[in-house]
A protein has these predicted regions:
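Histidine- and acidic-residue-rich, metal-dependent catalytic cores
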Residues: 2-407
C-alpha cells in the first residue's frame, strides 16, 4: 500500500492548472489556491472542520480541473475559440460536466456530489443548469463566490478602493448571482486588510496551515485512479501528446514489474510516469504544438518543462523519490541531458528506466504529424542511444524483451 499526501498533490495540480489559466484567460498564477483559501476562510462561518474542510479545499483547488479537456474538445469542432467568452457564458456547463466526472474517482472522505458540476450556478436560477441556491450544494456555492471574487480581484487595481468596490459588487449581486448566506459569510470573515493580503503570497502559507494534510493509504486501483486523473489533465494540454502520460505510466510500471521490483515501487513508477510531463502545463502551446523547428529560445523554454515538473512536485510532502523519477526523464548518462545535467553516477535505476520508457513511448505513439514507429525500430534507436552513452544499455535490452512480448 502506498501512502500519499493527496492534498499536497492536489495543490501541485492546481499550480499546473493555474499556468493554463494564466496563459489562456489572463488569470494570474495561484488562482486555484486563492479560491481554496477564500473558500476555507468562508468555511469558518459554518464551523466546517476536519474531513469536510479538506474536501472543500480539494474541490476548490480542482474546480477548473477540466479546463484543458474542455479546450481540447472545443478545438476538435473549431480551430479557433474565444476562451474568455466561451468559459464565462453559454459553454460554461461543459467544463463543469467534465470536471464533475473527472473527480468521481478521487479519494474524498465526504460526499462532494455536484460540487464541481454546480460551481457556476447563480442563486436566482439563471446559471448554466438553472439551479436555485437551495438546490446547490453549499460547497459549490462557496467555491462559486470565491472564484468570482478572485477573478474580479485580478481585474482591478489592488488599492484602497478595491475593498469598497468588492463590497458594493457583492451587495449589488446578493440574491441574484450569490445567495445571501455566502455573501454574509465572506463579509463576516474578511476585512479590508485580509482582503488586501490576497494580492501577496502570504495567503498560501495560511492555506496549508489551515487544511488537514493527513496522508492517505492507496491500494493499486486507487493509485491508478489518482494517477490517471492527473495524467488526463496533462495530456489534454496538447493534441500532440494525447495519452502520452498514460502510456508512460503503463509502460514504466510494466517494466518495473518485469524487472522484479516490489508492488510499492511498481505503483510509484506508475504515478511518476503519469506526472512526468506535468511541467508542460507551464509551457505555451505555441511551443508545444509548433510544426516547425523550434528556435534556440523556444527549445530552451521547452526544456524547462522537466524543471517545472520538479518544482511542481516539490510541493508534495515526502514525494522526493517519485518527483525525481518523474523530473529526471530527460537526463542523460553522459551529463548532457536537461534540465539538471545529471551524470550516470547521479542517476539511479528507476530514473534511468523512466528516461528509456519516455523515449520508447514518444517514438511508438501516433501523433498528428507522424505515425508511430514499430517496436523493433524503436528498440534499435534505443540501442543506438545506449551506445552513445545517452541511456542505460541494460535497460534498453530489457525493454526489447519486456515490451516485445505478445507482439
Amino acid at each position: 500500500m502506498l501512502s500519499i499526501d493527496i492534498v499536497g498533490l492536489t495543490g501541485a495540480c492546481s499550480y499546473a492548472l493555474d499556468c493554463i489559466e494564466a496563459e489562456l484567460v489572463n488569470i494570474k498564477n495561484k488562482h486555484g489556491k486563492r479560491v481554496a483559501y477564500i473558500s476555507i476562510r468562508m468555511a469558518e462561518y459554518w464551523k466546517i472542520q476536519g474531513d469536510e474542510l479538506q474536501d472543500l479545499a480539494m474541490c476548490a483547488l480542482l474546480h477548473d480541473n477540466a479546463l484543458t479537456q474542455y479546450i481540447s474538445e472545443e478545438l476538435k469542432k473549431d480551430s479557433v475559440i474565444d476562451l474568455k467568452k466561451d468559459l464565462s457564458e453559454e459553454k460554461t456547463n461543459l467544463h463543469c460536466i467534465y470536471g464533475e466526472k473527472n473527480i468521481t474517482k478521487l479519494p474524498f472522505k465526504t460526499d462532494v456530489t455536484n460540487v464541481i458540476l454546480y460551481h457556476h450556478e447563480h442563486a436566482d436560477g439563471t446559471g448554466p443548469f438553472q439551479k436555485k441556491w437551495n438546490e446547490i450544494p453549499l460547497f459549490a456555492r462557496i467555491i462559486h463566490l470565491a472564484d468570482i471574487i478572485d477573478i474580479i480581484r485580478n481585474s482591478i487595481d489592488s488599492d484602497d478602493n478595491s475593498w469598497d468596490f468588492m463590497c458594493q459588487y457583492l451587495s449589488k449581486n446578493k440574491d441574484s448571482l450569490f445567495d445571501s448566506e455566502c455573501v454574509n459569510a465572506f463579509l463576516h470573515v474578511f476585512t479590508k486588510e485580509s482582503f488586501m493580503c490576497l494580492s501577496d503570497d502570504s495567503f498560501e502559507t495560511k492555506l496549508w496551515k489551515a487544511i488537514p494534510r493527513e496522508k492517505l493509504v492507496f491500494d493499486w486501483e486507487m493509485c491508478k485512479d489518482v494517477a490517471d486523473f492527473f495524467a488526463k489533465i496533462v495530456d489534454y494540454k496538447s493534441s500532440f501528446t494525447s495519452r502520452h502520460s498514460i502510456g508512460v505510466a503503463e509502460k514504466a510500471s510494466m517494466l518495473a514489474q518485469y524487472m522484479g521490483y516490489d508492488s510499492i515501487t511498481v505503483q510509484k513508477m506508475y504515478l511518476a510516469g503519469a506526472l512526468h510531463d506535468i511541467g508542460k502545463m507551464a509551457v505555451g502551446n505555441e511551443i508545444l504544438e509548433k510544426p516547425d523547428k523550434l528556435t534556440d529560445d523556444e527549445f530552451s523554454k521547452m526544456k524547462n518543462h522537466a524543471g517545472y515538473t520538479y518544482l511542481i512536485l516539490s510541493e508534495v510532502n515526502d514525494f522526493e523519490e517519485i518527483r525525481d523519477w518523474a523530473a529526471f526523464h530527460h537526463e542523460k548518462l553522459n551529463g548532457k541531458g536537461y534540465p539538471f545535467g545529471k551524470t550516470a553516477a547521479e542517476l539511479n535505476e528507476p530514473e534511468r528506466m523512466m528516461a528509456c520508457v519516455d523515449i520508447y513511448q514518444a517514438l511508438t505513439e501516433d501523433r498528428p504529424y507522424k505515425k508511430g514507429l514499430s517496436h523493433e525500430k524503436t528498440c534499435d534507436i534505443l540501442d543506438d542511444m545506449a551506445q552513445k552513452d545517452f541511456i542505460d544499455s541494460d535497460i534498453s535490452k530489457i525493454i526489447r524483451e519486456c515490451f516485445g512480448r505478445n507482439r
